Amino acid sequence: MRFLPVNIDAIMVELSSLEQTMALTDQLQNNLAFWKIEEIIPAARTVLIRFNPILTDADTLAKNICTLDLTSGSIPSGELIIISVNYNGEDLAYVADHLGITVSEVINRHTNNEYQVAFCGFAPGFAYMVSNHAQLNVPRRQSPRVRIPAGSVALAGEFSSVYPQASPGGWQLIGITESAVWDINRDNPALFKPGSRVHFVDAAKSSKKYHLPMIKKEEKNNSQQDIKVLATGLQTLFQDNGRIGQAALGISESGAMDKSALHSANRVLGNPINEVALEITQGGLKTQINRSMLIAVTGAVCDINITTLLGEKYTAPMYQPILLEKGDTVELGNIKCGVRSYLAVRGGFQVSPILTSCSFDTLAQVGPPPITIGQTLAIKSTNIKASVSLNESPAINYPCPGDVVVLDIVLGPRTDWFTPNAIKLLTEQLWRVTPASNRIGLRLSGDISLTRDKLQELPSEGTCSGAIQIPANGQPVLFLNDHPLTGGYPIIGAVCKYHLDLSGQIPINAKIKFNPVGIFKEFEGSHIDHV
């Protein structure tokens, strides 16, 4: 057992088997509140633990975990779900050849053995299923596919799964199902959850119909039309603090990229700081106002251009309440520094939360969809008693293209997978933010790629916002709010939590200098075997 650093509020426990991982997960679930643990993300051989750093620390958690008996404990047994599969996958013949058996035997092994969901990750509703008897252990594809259809039934390593949505992927495809394993309109969007038992049946041999949970019809929004959107800019989304505690469904937190700016916008207006606002990327939002209201704009620096019904024009200040009247138009100019601005209204936007949040997750495609031209927005009741704030100001210095931004990082959990020279390059060389960057992550480019010391395949393990993942090309990807919950490339370090807002405001062609706050060091209790 090893205890590896992840961030100032997270550690990773590395174990020797999936059975140990599930045993530890089972024990941690019983100690979440007592040990001040906020969330756990189990994976194939690791458990990522996010904790409250004010109430506990990594060393204390490591010592507590060392007292646990991991010889007992298993995946809780859940409901049985039957999935009908058409076994016509593109990789079926490869799987048979790799295992030295016939295609028919592959299908028999997959259908004659019950699977159980060990954990969820990669994408919402993506379940990693295991079977003690199926004997279908195959490697991932060397070259991942750009697009795998939703419903594809696949194998990789010791796991089987069903792709919940169309997405890239590197698993071996053996079939496809019509079952909707992820649908946000169901009461429980994810068909599978940890503990679920799964029985695959061959659709070609069965005429029986299997009924899955009913899908609710979407409710139409008949709200009033307080604001009409005339232009959206590059991207405008609803965002709040995000989805906390949804890791069991394979969903990361998402939420506003610059939470300090979101909170300031709401404090300016007397709203609760988590009230949903518009996150506008690179400016360009233009709206028509259809009633009197109070707004505020914070975050990335831009002009707030207002034209009244009578044609008068003026520029309003950021970080201040702005009174608007019916007939006004508001247009945000091009961004001068930073990337994302936040527009809030007093009382808040009328938006229905999805899985506890009004944020749109661009990777998971969960939440109210992106704002479109012609869309109308409604405001909730403005009958709030809190006073406005006139003393708000930016919490960070917003960088401009070409600037060098210094980000503090914690080294780990897989720093020791890289050569000493790669670790040196990570912190000494400048990394340019490329145009391929988005809310999922900043794709960086450096003069010299980072090289690995350990070349074996890394079993999927949990990730966090700020994680610096190093894919095969050696050029880092800095994970931001919409990052995948688990990943299969090693994480060399992570941006400290207090610099995450700044990370979300770094523009294209700015450069990043990573500043380690300490050396890579495992926590006390590492390498103690309890089983």
What is each stretch, according to the model?
Residues M1-V531:
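Conserved "landmark" site that anchors the functional core of diverse proteins
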